[in-house]
């Protein structure tokens, strides 16, 4: 393919790049839209969930994400400046070869590699609940729109929904290469990734289960400086739906081959390279039609977890519907959590309503909420005692097992009154049955380690 075919003489006026912000209805949900976000300096965002997902993104597409804390990452956890700078090599990457009017065009949305080559417009959408974000690029020269959405599912992990729309009056032949790059294997903590990333690369092992198209990202062994066995028994995983019979890539080694128009070879087993998950397929996109596909990434997966997902993909038991329902269930749970702390309000100003929801959400993420009328769970209470006073816990460990699975605040007060140990009394009265709280911190504040 001749890359000079891409050179379309355009000189967009500055008026086309006016930055605006407004609330819009998108896919039956309220989103705040920033038009022409590419005309702004990159800024940092966070995406929340009702569960233990965390995701920090730059407006240029760079991101880090994982579950629980920075040691369970699917993309490297760095400071925000590095995340912004590594947008070309970490996270989402999409490249399209388009046949139009007898010519071939190469389009790489959201990439600075093609800055000034096409007349484009980039928009950002974030839903009012803060758990979904959409990146959109409109190519006015090729009359194409590409967008992708990040959201999450407690059961399945991180969900990326990609959409390619043909805005022209002609059918287009399009070769797609789309996916994720710089995927971490399980067992790589943020500390070792930050200072010994080349050593981590040497231990990486990426495998494809060809029947289901599921990518498995693991270490050949857990990296330890001890003379002892250290098997890596878990992995991170990525899988996809929506494209028929795609070619799968597990690294970024063939990206330039695709840019040059060369045929790609499926990768099944890649060692000592940064992990990636790309799907390659050729489609015919009719005028005014769109093509959708999905990629799902998760961390901390056991052999049984991976086997279960693989079987679900092969059976294809309405998996896309199951995935969508899981995502929407997460949104409903998030709303319920905020509602429990009076985070829902209705006024004449939708932006004020959204601001109040957001403020309440981040307050309860910091401080937590009292769930189910202050009901206390035995396991959480026992864990609390074991960490608060280890010596005391060893003495009362056996009697604690006789507690009911759930009990009330009055029950724990009565328990404290009947016990002669002053430390136990104090710990009972100090215990707070909070949920949803987490230690704060993010890539812009690296001195704080969140959890």
Residue ranges and their predicted role:
Residues 1-451:
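Anionic coordination/interaction segments
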């Amino acid at each position: 393919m001749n890359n000079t075919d891409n050179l379309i003489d355009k000189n967009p006026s500055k008026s086309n790049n006016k930055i605006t912000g407004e609330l819009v209805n998108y896919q039956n949900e309220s989103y705040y839209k920033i038009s022409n976000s590419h005309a702004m300096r990159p800024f940092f965002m966070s995406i929340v969930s009702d569960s233990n997902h965390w995701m920090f993104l730059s407006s240029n597409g760079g991101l880090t994400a994982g579950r629980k804390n920075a040691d369970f990452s699917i993309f490297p956890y760095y400071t925000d400046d590095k995340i912004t700078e590594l947008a070309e090599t970490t996270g989402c990457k999409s490249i399209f070869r388009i046949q139009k009017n007898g010519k071939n065009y190469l389009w790489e949305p959201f990439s600075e590699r093609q800055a000034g080559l096409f007349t484009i417009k980039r928009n950002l959408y974030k839903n009012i609940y803060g758990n979904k974000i959409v990146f959109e690029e409109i190519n006015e020269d090729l009359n194409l729109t590409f967008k992708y959405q990040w959201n999450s599912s407690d059961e399945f992990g991180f969900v990326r929904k990609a959409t390619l729309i043909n805005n022209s009056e002609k059918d287009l032949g399009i070769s797609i290469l789309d996916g994720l790059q710089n995927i971490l294997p399980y067992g790589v903590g943020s500390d070792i990734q930050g200072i010994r990333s080349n050593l981590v690369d040497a231990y990486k092992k990426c495998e494809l289960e060809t029947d289901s198209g599921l990518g498995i990202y693991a270490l050949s062994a857990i990296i330890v400086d001890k003379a002892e066995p250290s098997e890596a028994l878990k992995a991170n995983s990525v899988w996809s739906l929506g494209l028929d019979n795609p070619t799968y890539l597990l690294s970024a080694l063939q990206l330039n081959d695709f840019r040059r128009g060369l045929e790609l070879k499926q990768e099944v087993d890649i060692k000592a390279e940064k992990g990636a998950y790309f799907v390659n397929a050729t489609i015919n996109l009719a005028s005014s039609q769109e093509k959708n596909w999905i990629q799902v990434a998760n961390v901390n997966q056991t052999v049984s977890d991976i086997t279960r997902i693989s079987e679900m993909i092969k059976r294809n038991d309405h998996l896309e519907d199951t995935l969508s329902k899981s995502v929407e269930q997460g949104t409903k749970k998030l709303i319920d959590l905020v509602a429990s702390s009076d985070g829902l309000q209705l006024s004449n100003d939708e932006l004020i309503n959204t601001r109040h929801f957001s403020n309440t959400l981040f307050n309860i993420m910091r401080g937590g909420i009292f769930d189910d009328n202050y009901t206390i769970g035995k396991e959480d209470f026992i864990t609390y005692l074991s960490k608060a006073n280890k010596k005391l816990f060893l003495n009362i460990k056996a009697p604690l097992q006789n507690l009911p699975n759930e009990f009330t605040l009055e029950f724990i007060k009565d328990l404290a009154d009947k016990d002669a140990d002053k430390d136990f009394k104090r710990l009972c009265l100090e215990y707070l049955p909070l949920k949803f709280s987490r230690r704060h911190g993010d890539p812009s504040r690296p001195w704080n380690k969140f959890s």
